[in-house]
Amino acid sequence: MKKVGIVMGSDSDLPILRKTMDTLASLDIPFECHVYSAHRTPEEARDFALNARKNGIGVLIAAAGMAAHLAGAIAANTTLPVIGLPCKGPCFDGMDALLSTVMMPSGIPVATVAVNGGVNAALLAAQILAVADEELAAKLEAKRASDAAAVLKKDAALQEELNK
Protein backbone atom coordinates (compact mmCIF):
# COMPACT_ATOMS: atom_id res chain seq x y z
CA MET A 1 0.00 0.00 0.00
CA LYS A 2 1.18 3.51 -0.76
CA LYS A 3 2.00 5.76 2.20
CA VAL A 4 0.47 9.07 3.14
CA GLY A 5 3.05 11.83 3.40
CA ILE A 6 2.23 14.37 6.08
CA VAL A 7 3.99 17.70 6.39
CA MET A 8 3.27 20.51 8.83
CA GLY A 9 4.59 24.04 8.74
CA SER A 10 5.24 24.15 12.48
CA ASP A 11 5.12 21.74 15.38
CA SER A 12 2.34 23.92 16.79
CA ASP A 13 0.15 22.06 14.26
CA LEU A 14 1.03 18.68 15.80
CA PRO A 15 -2.08 18.35 18.04
CA ILE A 16 -4.27 18.52 14.93
CA LEU A 17 -2.05 16.10 13.04
CA ARG A 18 -2.06 13.57 15.87
CA LYS A 19 -5.75 13.06 15.03
CA THR A 20 -4.76 12.62 11.39
CA MET A 21 -2.09 10.06 12.25
CA ASP A 22 -4.40 8.21 14.66
CA THR A 23 -7.07 7.96 11.97
CA LEU A 24 -4.59 6.66 9.39
CA ALA A 25 -3.21 4.15 11.90
CA SER A 26 -6.74 2.92 12.69
CA LEU A 27 -7.10 2.04 9.00
CA ASP A 28 -3.63 0.43 8.85
CA ILE A 29 -2.40 3.06 6.41
CA PRO A 30 1.35 3.67 6.57
CA PHE A 31 2.49 7.28 6.79
CA GLU A 32 5.46 9.49 7.41
CA CYS A 33 5.33 12.91 9.03
CA HIS A 34 7.69 15.90 8.86
CA VAL A 35 7.96 19.55 9.90
CA TYR A 36 8.95 21.67 6.89
CA SER A 37 8.08 25.32 6.46
CA ALA A 38 7.26 26.84 3.08
CA HIS A 39 9.05 29.98 4.27
CA ARG A 40 11.80 28.81 6.66
CA THR A 41 12.83 25.53 4.98
CA PRO A 42 11.63 25.88 1.38
CA GLU A 43 14.31 23.58 -0.07
CA GLU A 44 13.39 20.73 2.28
CA ALA A 45 9.68 21.20 1.57
CA ARG A 46 10.36 21.18 -2.17
CA ASP A 47 12.59 18.09 -1.96
CA PHE A 48 9.96 16.26 0.11
CA ALA A 49 7.37 16.91 -2.61
CA LEU A 50 9.71 16.14 -5.50
CA ASN A 51 10.74 12.79 -4.00
CA ALA A 52 7.39 11.74 -2.54
CA ARG A 53 6.36 9.41 -5.37
CA LYS A 54 9.69 7.55 -5.46
CA ASN A 55 9.54 7.27 -1.66
CA GLY A 56 6.29 5.29 -1.88
CA ILE A 57 3.88 8.10 -1.07
CA GLY A 58 0.52 8.11 -2.86
CA VAL A 59 -1.09 11.21 -1.37
CA LEU A 60 0.16 14.18 0.64
CA ILE A 61 -1.39 16.13 3.51
CA ALA A 62 0.04 19.60 4.13
CA ALA A 63 -1.02 21.40 7.32
CA ALA A 64 -0.28 25.01 8.15
CA GLY A 65 -1.76 28.01 9.89
CA MET A 66 -1.66 31.74 9.29
CA ALA A 67 -0.25 32.47 5.80
CA ALA A 68 -0.51 28.71 5.07
CA HIS A 69 1.44 28.55 1.82
CA LEU A 70 2.76 25.05 2.52
CA ALA A 71 0.08 23.06 0.67
CA GLY A 72 0.53 25.20 -2.43
CA ALA A 73 4.30 24.93 -2.25
CA ILE A 74 4.02 21.15 -1.99
CA ALA A 75 1.46 20.95 -4.82
CA ALA A 76 3.68 23.05 -7.07
CA ASN A 77 6.36 20.35 -6.85
CA THR A 78 4.38 17.13 -7.35
CA THR A 79 1.52 15.72 -9.37
CA LEU A 80 0.42 13.55 -6.45
CA PRO A 81 -2.86 14.57 -4.81
CA VAL A 82 -2.31 17.19 -2.11
CA ILE A 83 -4.77 17.73 0.72
CA GLY A 84 -4.50 21.09 2.43
CA LEU A 85 -5.27 21.16 6.13
CA PRO A 86 -5.63 24.76 7.34
CA CYS A 87 -4.94 25.17 11.06
CA LYS A 88 -6.16 27.83 13.45
CA GLY A 89 -3.55 30.43 14.28
CA PRO A 90 -3.46 33.32 16.72
CA CYS A 91 -5.75 35.53 14.62
CA PHE A 92 -8.77 35.32 12.35
CA ASP A 93 -9.91 31.94 13.76
CA GLY A 94 -8.17 30.06 10.93
CA MET A 95 -9.83 31.96 8.09
CA ASP A 96 -6.46 33.29 6.91
CA ALA A 97 -5.12 29.73 6.67
CA LEU A 98 -8.29 28.47 4.98
CA LEU A 99 -8.22 31.14 2.29
CA SER A 100 -4.47 30.77 1.73
CA THR A 101 -4.90 27.02 1.29
CA VAL A 102 -8.03 26.88 -0.84
CA MET A 103 -7.31 29.75 -3.27
CA MET A 104 -4.87 28.09 -5.65
CA PRO A 105 -4.16 29.13 -9.22
CA SER A 106 -5.46 27.06 -12.11
CA GLY A 107 -3.27 24.04 -12.76
CA ILE A 108 -2.02 23.54 -9.18
CA PRO A 109 -4.96 22.01 -7.28
CA VAL A 110 -5.08 21.51 -3.53
CA ALA A 111 -8.05 19.62 -2.09
CA THR A 112 -8.85 21.45 1.14
CA VAL A 113 -10.62 20.24 4.27
CA ALA A 114 -12.05 22.33 7.10
CA VAL A 115 -9.95 24.35 9.52
CA ASN A 116 -8.43 21.88 12.00
CA GLY A 117 -10.06 19.05 10.01
CA GLY A 118 -7.34 16.51 10.69
CA VAL A 119 -9.65 13.50 10.76
CA ASN A 120 -11.25 14.41 7.43
CA ALA A 121 -7.81 14.98 5.90
CA ALA A 122 -6.90 11.42 6.86
CA LEU A 123 -10.20 10.03 5.59
CA LEU A 124 -9.89 11.87 2.28
CA ALA A 125 -6.35 10.52 1.88
CA ALA A 126 -7.70 7.04 2.64
CA GLN A 127 -10.47 7.42 0.05
CA ILE A 128 -7.92 8.46 -2.58
CA LEU A 129 -5.76 5.42 -1.82
CA ALA A 130 -8.85 3.17 -1.72
CA VAL A 131 -9.56 3.86 -5.39
CA ALA A 132 -6.90 1.21 -6.13
CA ASP A 133 -7.21 -0.85 -2.92
CA GLU A 134 -10.37 -2.90 -2.33
CA GLU A 135 -9.28 -3.96 1.17
CA LEU A 136 -8.92 -0.33 2.23
CA ALA A 137 -12.25 0.52 0.58
CA ALA A 138 -13.89 -2.20 2.70
CA LYS A 139 -12.30 -0.75 5.86
CA LEU A 140 -13.70 2.68 4.99
CA GLU A 141 -17.15 1.22 4.42
CA ALA A 142 -16.96 -0.58 7.78
CA LYS A 143 -15.90 2.66 9.48
CA ARG A 144 -18.86 4.51 7.97
CA ALA A 145 -21.22 1.77 9.14
CA SER A 146 -19.72 1.87 12.64
CA ASP A 147 -20.00 5.66 12.76
CA ALA A 148 -23.66 5.44 11.67
CA ALA A 149 -24.38 2.81 14.32
CA ALA A 150 -22.86 5.06 16.98
CA VAL A 151 -25.14 7.94 15.95
CA LEU A 152 -28.21 5.69 16.02
CA LYS A 153 -27.24 4.41 19.47
CA LYS A 154 -27.05 8.02 20.71
CA ASP A 155 -30.45 8.73 19.17
CA ALA A 156 -31.95 5.67 20.88
CA ALA A 157 -30.53 6.83 24.22
CA LEU A 158 -31.97 10.30 23.69
CA GLN A 159 -35.38 8.91 22.74
CA GLU A 160 -35.38 6.72 25.85
CA GLU A 161 -34.51 9.72 28.04
CA LEU A 162 -37.21 11.91 26.47
CA ASN A 163 -39.90 9.23 26.76
CA LYS A 164 -39.46 8.59 30.50
Residue positions per predicted region:
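C-terminal binding/interaction regions
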Residues: 8-15, 19-20, 95-164
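Glycine/charged-rich beta-loop-alpha catalytic/anionic-binding loops adjacent to active sites
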Residues: 2, 29-32, 79-80, 102-110
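Glycine-rich phosphate/diphosphate-binding loop of Rossmann-like nucleotide-binding domains
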Residues: 2-40
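Glycine/small-residue-rich loop that forms an oxyanion/phosphate-binding "nest" at active or ligand-binding sites
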Residues: 77-102, 106
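Glycine-rich phosphate-binding loop
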Residues: 48-86
